[in-house]
Amino acid sequence: MTQGPIQVNSEIGRLKTVLLKRPGKELENLVPDHLSGLLFDDIPYLKVAQEEHDKFAQTLRDEGVEVVYLEKLAAEAIADKDVREQFIDDILAESQKTVLGHEAEIKTFFAKLSDQELIDKIMAGVRKEEIELKTTHLVEYMDDRYPFYLDPMPNLYFTRDPQASVGRGMTINRMYWRARRRESLFMTYILKYHPRFKDADVPVWLDRNSPFNIEGGDELILSKEALAIGISERTSAQAIERLARNIFKDESTTFKKVIAIEIPNSRTFMHLDTVFTMIDYDKFTVHSAIFKEENNMNLFTIEYDEAKDDIKITHSNKLRETLADVLGVEKIEFIPTGNGDVIDGAREQWNDGSNTLCIRPGVVVTYDRNYVSNQLLRDKGIKVLEITGSELVRGRGGPRCMSQPLFREDI
């Protein structure tokens, strides 16, 4: 089989190509009255957030990683006039709650923009003051204090969640919160129309029209034979089972097991990758709370049963033993955020201390502010590449959240 543009069969194989989104004007459209609806706790300073993100990207390039940007790929994907018009229609259709019947005026506004300007504007959001309206309808006389016709998408720099590379294919995800649901439309168009992907026959294991929610922060590729997926507030058990069935029936895949891991429904445990991330063949960074719960967690191993031509599901509550078994190692080492200290651990977990990006076995990218965790990693033989994230972290995501691997070398 010809090598395609997507290949991710582990969390730790040498990273060759990664998808990022540089923070843009969408962060400047965050206002205190509407923070919670857009899933933010604070407002990052855009200039500094961009500087921090640029240094993150350069750190990856310095390690030989090709960095591609969501906003650039999306603009290139809509170069065809008909595709561009369909993309605009789709965006407006998914923004009906705020568009308020002004599709024609918004389309006139968009017509003046280049492809890149259009993508940037849709991501940033369209303020009402940007659109000229004639007051011919009653709704236009109403004093609607909501400031946007198209909401900004400030979470887009967390490219991990709207899509996920799984083997040689992707999941294009139905996001849990309405504020993020439009985000996966960009990758839908990129796979379908971008020259790099459109003729590559990239399998889509789940698409965004699925009735069940799933987010990439809950999807971990343990090995070429096993996935771990969090059952969380944002990822449903139904989505995990459907994904497993779709993967198992594809003869080109090597995946044989999907480990569904139930995690608490809370912002602290937003996704599985805020609980633990894999950083070496037998090592994981973990939320220190795992040590209290690791033998009481609900784990469900989904496998294909050839005799029954159906899936079978087995239950366990031993996290460490289950991981060791599927990874084929003698034992698993958990490295706790903040060394498990009640103060340091809580502080560094809040600042995404366990959300590390592995760029090859034993080499990770972390926020420099999590100095207790970083020193512990070094003591365990891990090479730590630190980046500054004082503004980036305000979105409550770390280096893994901010990156979507498109290609890793197999291990």
UniProtKB/Swiss-Prot annotation:
InterPro entries: Arg_deiminase. One of its GO terms (cellular component) is cytoplasm. It is found in: Cytoplasm. The active site is at residue 401. One of its GO terms (biological process) is arginine catabolic process to ornithine. Pathway: Amino-acid degradation; L-arginine degradation via ADI pathway; carbamoyl phosphate from L-arginine: step 1/2. It is an enzyme of class 3 (hydrolase). Its main location: cytoplasm. It comes from the Bacteria. Keywords: Arginine metabolism, Cytoplasm, Hydrolase. The keyword Transmembrane helix does not apply. NCBIfam families: arcA, PRK01388.1. This is Arginine deiminase. It comes from Staphylococcus haemolyticus (strain JCSC1435). The gene is arcA.
